[in-house]
Amino acid sequence: MNNFTIKETPIKDLVIIEPKVFGDERGFFQETYNKESFAELGLNMEFVQDNHSKSKKGVLRGLHFQTKNVQGKLVRVTRGAVYDVAVDLRTNSPTFGEWYGVLLTEKNKIMFYVPEGFAHGFLTLEDDTEFLYKCTNLYSPEHDSGLRWNDPTINIDWKFEEFNITEEDLTISDKDKVQQLFDKSSTY
């Protein structure tokens, strides 16, 4: 029996994964990754690095990708909530340059698989949000790259109004404030 179900998104290979959660008066139990179960669902990846971040409300991280040693990421929230976004950078894809976003929370327990060839970022919606991601390749500082979170060509709707966050409330790293623009990049 497979403890995961997949929901397709409008962008090929970018999927939402819903784990089966076993709950009772003690709490809950869930698998967050099972290589065999994922393979049954057509998800054949191998993870080599796990990352864990903690952020206050209004932190916007991204949009990150690596130009070589590209990373696929399986992401989830263990505390709090994020609006998670992926941008298709696969030049041969019919959805090249398109984005998709999903709400990940500690309550909904869903996971988002962002395959290799995508830029990735997220906006934290609560204080003390904890975010975990498994990566298919090691972090490579010399290949680290990104796109600007507010790139006018990609035009991501970060749903600030819906989440009661203003642009003035955002906390963004200096690096992410000056990432390249989509139509000026030659890195993908």
Q: Which role does the model predict for each range below?
A:
Residues M1-K107, E126-D128, C135-Y188:
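Non-catalytic, conserved peripheral segments adjacent to functional cores
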Residues F112, H120-L125, Y133:
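Short beta-strand His + acidic residue motifs that chelate non-heme Fe in jelly-roll/DSBH
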